[in-house]
C-alpha cells in the first residue's frame, strides 16, 4: 500500500535493526485519513470472505480494525490486556508475549460477543514474531468461530511470524512488508532501500 509506505518513510523512525517507531500516525497519534484508507484496503482484500466480526487486540489494533469494520459493515471485538471490573467471568483467555515490551500479557475476549457462527477477520498493527496473532487465533478458536484471515498493517517480514502463520495455511494480508531495518533504513519487500528521516 503505497500511501502507507510513504507514511512509514516520512514519519517512521528506525530505533534499531528490529524496532520501527510509528507513533506519529499509528500507535499513539492516529492519522484518521490514513486509517480510513487502511480500512478500505482491508475491506477490499477480504470482501469475498463473508466476515461477520473483526477481532483485534488493544490498543493499537483498534483504529485499523474499526475502519475495516465500518467498510465491511460488521462489529469489532478487541482482546483486553488488562483485567476489567466489568469483564470478570465468562472470558476466553490466552497468553501473548510482546516483543516490543518484552513481557507476557494475558489477553481475553468476552464469550458474550463471539461464537461458533462467526467468521472472523483478525487485524493488528504489527506482525513480528506472530505471538499476538497466535493469541488472537487461540481466542477465536476457543469460541468455535472460523478464521477468514489476518490483516496486518505493517509486517516485519525479516522476522518469522508471517512465515509461521502462512505455513499453517492462514491467509495473511500485510499492507506494508518490511524486509529490513538495517542501517537506519527501511527496506520494503520487493522495493528499493529508502532512508528514514
Swiss-Prot record:
InterPro entries: PRibTrfase_dom, PRTase-like, Pur/Pyrimidine_PRTase, Xanthine_PRibTrfase
One Pfam family per UniProt: Pribosyltran
Pathways per UniProt: Purine metabolism; XMP biosynthesis via salvage pathway; XMP from xanthine: step 1/1
Residues at which 5-phospho-alpha-D-ribose 1-diphosphate binds: 128-132
Group of enzyme by EC: transferase
GO molecular function per UniProt: xanthine phosphoribosyltransferase activity
Catalytic reaction annotation: XMP + diphosphate = xanthine + 5-phospho-alpha-D-ribose 1-diphosphate
Residues that hold xanthine according to the record: 20, 27, 156
Swiss-Prot/TrEMBL GO biological process terms: purine ribonucleoside salvage; xanthine metabolic process; XMP salvage
Keywords of this entry: Cytoplasm, Glycosyltransferase, Purine salvage, Transferase
EC number: 2.4.2.22
Protein's recorded name: Xanthine phosphoribosyltransferase
Gene behind this protein: xpt
Amino acid at each position: 500500500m503505497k500511501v502507507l509506505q510513504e507514511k512509514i518513510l516520512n514519519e517512521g523512525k528506525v530505533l534499531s535493526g528490529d524496532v520501527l517507531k510509528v507513533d506519529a500516525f499509528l500507535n499513539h497519534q492516529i492519522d484518521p485519513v490514513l486509517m480510513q484508507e487502511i480500512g478500505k484496503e482491508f475491506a477490499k482484500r477480504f470482501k469475498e470472505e463473508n466476515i461477520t466480526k473483526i477481532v483485534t487486540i488493544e490498543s493499537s489494533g483498534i483504529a485499523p480494525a474499526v475502519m475495516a469494520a465500518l467498510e465491511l459493515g460488521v462489529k469489532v471485538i478487541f482482546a483486553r490486556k488488562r483485567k476489567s471490573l466489568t469483564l470478570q467471568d465468562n472470558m476466553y483467555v490466552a497468553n501473548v508475549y510482546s516483543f516490543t515490551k518484552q513481557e507476557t500479557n494475558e489477553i481475553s475476549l468476552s464469550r458474550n460477543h463471539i461464537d461458533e457462527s462467526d467468521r472472523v477477520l483478525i487485524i493488528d498493527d504489527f506482525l513480528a514474531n506472530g505471538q499476538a496473532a497466535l493469541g488472537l487465533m487461540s481466542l477465536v478458536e476457543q469460541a468455535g468461530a472460523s478464521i477468514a484471515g489476518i490483516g496486518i498493517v505493517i509486517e516485519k517480514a525479516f522476522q518469522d511470524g508471517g512465515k509461521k502463520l502462512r505455513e499453517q495455511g492462514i491467509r495473511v494480508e500485510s499492507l506494508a512488508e518490511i524486509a529490513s531495518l538495517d542501517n537506519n533504513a527501511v527496506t520494503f519487500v520487493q522495493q528499493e532501500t529508502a532512508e528514514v528521516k
